[in-house]
């Protein structure tokens, strides 16, 4: 019975509670208000009280407004209210549609709006106390704050969907706006779930790289907001995520990983750290060039710098693989070449005002600059190597100074007069070998600084006594620095040639201390000969040259054979090449000449006989000469009839030129006046001969060198031609002027012909014919009543001129009689006067030209 009564009472209590339950539709949090919305039929809060048991109480009231079916209740919040809105418990009163329901029970935060944050909540990945700034953060004492688990493998999140952080804020300060929340370590994106099931999304602070130390094949990345669980940590190098197995250790401030960079190129990389997929900014690391050694150069001359070291160039795959620069102090060194371990560049001379004797070197490759210090120290002599050329030692190095001030030390003792030359760059010093010194240590002192020393072992060398002629078989050598153990042995020479190898012993040997004179018999040879002389255990290899071919002259004979006279020729056609104007001429047979002083070949039309000729004998070139040619005459061509004063002839032949010496005789008389010019290379001469007509002539062409007749030819002159005449009335008579060409002296006869052939009574003589010049004659027409049958007054009729057996006829004479109109006759007279004036002008011009 008691149990039944208990259940009845419990049911009634529960019903009363559920009946008074408040179920909001939504919330809004503002700086100056809290807003809660309800359905019209639901219970709603009218006021709330913040209670401290036995201490204090702070009451606040809602203003509720019904709008259709939604009731909105607003709790005004003044600035002074924020500090009071915090208690051990919250009491509330409720109504339903204006009817009081109840007051006094503890109100859970489940029914209240979420806190309003006024600044971003962004804890460090290490966690710890973090300021949470906002309003309504702690209306009542919290036990915990719920965090949603987005990263199942995070060791701080256990295995559930949420994890709990002890919720007592770390500060009891009356500042209710900035409260301290203890946060566990984490990274990336996280969510806080408030008591009303609304959420706050936030992220931990992004990782930040402060520095990266390169320690051989490891990288030590130092920064903030890394994470100490490697499963959530990634590293990118140039946007490529490295193998997780290369990450050695992780912590909140440092990450250590493997990165073995072994390329011989200078490079730079961008590094990023990611925690929970949130990435840091890029941080650049560089593997800079490492210049370690540099040669010295003269400060006032400049010179070639050779910088040795590591990573002295960029990767071939780099888009800027030519962006390399070297700066010495404030001066730019011009790049000559670069490789992974060497840079060569030219440095200009420094002014004498530069007092420092050293300058720092900066090598930049794609904007990556060396971090080590390398100084260029000026004017410090150094030796890198040497070579022996017969009795000279060529020392290679730098800063050798000049021949007047530089000192030579041999075996630490200064010697004098040994320097032969120092080049202008001070990089090559030549000195004579001291007699009888086989090995020594040499150093150079310049600018009061002594160079390093280098050991020199003098080797045997040979010198040919004279340049051998191609006909010589006996070759004489002198051997120097022969060891005492070999001094009495017989030297042997070996000729090293592609076509013939021969070995012979000296047939004559003379010894003077360490010098051996010897003679060898060698088969006839030519060109440059490589040889090896051996005496005992000493061997010397070198080469000598036979005399170069020398041409004195080359002549071309009448059979078109060129013969060159000189010396140094050989009697093997395959060892000799002939060139004319750079064109090679192949020899067709052996040169049968035992004295090596002449060579002949047949001249062909395709060779440029006017070009320079030279020989290539076994690779040695002769001097260049011009061929002495003699003209070859074939025939004479007459292209046109001769005019009054002469005409052109064309002489056909070969090897002709403007100065070809020949004579022309016509009818036993030598032609003095002739003008010739070369046509068509050297195969024809066109000559203008001044010889008056009219009779044709037979001529001879004679070659002046031997006065032989080389051709006979004939030519004829043109007949006279008539162009126009003056106008004369036959019944009055008068002087008739005839204009034309190719008139000859004397004039035989001038006839006016009616029918053109002079038959019957249709012709009239013009008497007293006179030769004026080759273009004009005159004659006199006696006044006559003669008429021409069938010829109308004013018509043109024929006129014929005969001179020295040649005649010309033309229809140019105008037939006029006395019955002609006076005006017509006057016009004719005017025309004739104009004609005479023209003739006079022509005569004056001709006289003027002839006097020039």
Curated annotation (Swiss-Prot):
* Regions of this protein lying in the Cytoplasmic compartment: 852
- Keywords, comma-separated and alphabetical: Glycoprotein, Membrane, Signal, Transmembrane, Transmembrane helix
Membrane topology of this protein: Single-pass type I membrane protein
Q: One GO term of the cellular component aspect?
A: external side of plasma membrane
Where do glycans attach? 31, 47, 67, 97, 129, 201, 215, 228, 260, 323, 352, 356, 404, 441, 476, 483, 501, 512, 574, 592, 635, 658, 661, 679-680, 723, 757, 761, 773, 785, 800
List the InterPro entries hit by this protein, alphabetically: Dictyostelium_Tiger (IPR052014), Ig-like_fold (IPR013783), Ig_E-set (IPR014756), IPT_dom (IPR002909)
Its domain of life reads Eukaryota
Q: State if Iron is listed as a keyword.
A: no
Record carries keyword Iron-sulfur: no
Extracellular topological domain residue ranges: 19-830
Q: Where in the cell is it found?
A: Membrane
> Which parts of the chain span the membrane according to its record?
831-851
Q: Where is the IPT/TIG domain?
A: 290-367
**Quick one: signal sequence residues?**
1-18
Q: Which residues form a coiled coil?
A: none
**Name of the protein this chain belongs to:** Tiger protein I3
Question: Gene encoding it?
Answer: tgrI3
